[in-house]
């Protein structure tokens, strides 16, 4: 799993994302006890979560800020040492340490930078590749992409190059058997429309969110693209 965040919309959307991601991680942790609801029995499941953040890149005003892999509250930047921690990024959600580390990661989220989604997905792929499923074990591999803005340097302007780079990374993930969910809280986010690459910024953003998810461009029910216009809905 991945929790990715963009930053250019500021604290308001970040404050909406934090409880949403917390609820997600708590739900995953609750599922580790299996159908019987009792920890330490045969049907326990060791669900795991890893967290990355994405924001700025090399040509941003704050170069590579908030583009990182989290291990607990520690942050390892994409441009320096993030790849060294791909192998240790996953946290076991059936253990107190794993749950505490994910809580600490969520607490360390910051809102400052751009919205280069492609780097978040690239790091997500790196973590999955560094942690192959052992022989004889079955796992569903999932990326959950949270974003509060359009892909690119400015959250209010759709950047086609950034979007296309993200779609390349999404295709890599899907070709490796990953299910990819996208969650948008930017103004105009609408999971019921296919969007339009050549339309307005909002139309293009909805097109992107459909394409990057495992909807693969076609609105579905249930959907791999989830949207919420405000914190309460999310």
What are these regions (language model features)?
Residues 1-234:
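P/S/T/G-enriched low-complexity
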């Amino acid at each position: 799993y991945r929790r990715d965040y963009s930053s250019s919309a500021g604290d308001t959307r970040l404050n909406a994302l934090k409880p949403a991601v917390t609820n997600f991680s708590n739900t995953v942790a609750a599922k580790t006890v299996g159908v019987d609801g009792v920890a330490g029995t045969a049907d326990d499941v060791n669900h795991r979560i890893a967290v990355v953040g994405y924001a700025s890149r090399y040509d941003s005003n704050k170069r590579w800020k908030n583009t990182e892999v989290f291990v607990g509250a520690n942050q390892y930047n994409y441009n320096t040492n993030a790849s060294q921690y791909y192998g240790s990024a996953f946290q076991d959600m059936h253990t107190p340490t794993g749950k505490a580390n994910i809580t600490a990661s969520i607490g360390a989220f910051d809102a400052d930078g751009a919205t280069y989604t492609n780097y978040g997905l690239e790091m997500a792929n790196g973590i999955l590749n560094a942690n192959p499923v052992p022989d004889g074990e079955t796992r569903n591999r999932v990326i959950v992409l949270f974003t509060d803005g359009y892909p690119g340097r400015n959250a209010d302007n759709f950047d086609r190059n950034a979007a296309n780079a993200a779609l390349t990374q999404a295709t890599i993930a899907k070709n490796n058997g990953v299910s990819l969910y996208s969650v948008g809280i930017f103004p105009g986010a609408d999971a019921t429309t296919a969007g339009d690459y050549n339309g307005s910024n909002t139309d293009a953003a909805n097109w992107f969110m459909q394409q990057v998810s495992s909807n693969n461009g076609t609105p579905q029910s249930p959907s791999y693209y989830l949207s919420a216009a405000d914190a309460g809905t999310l």
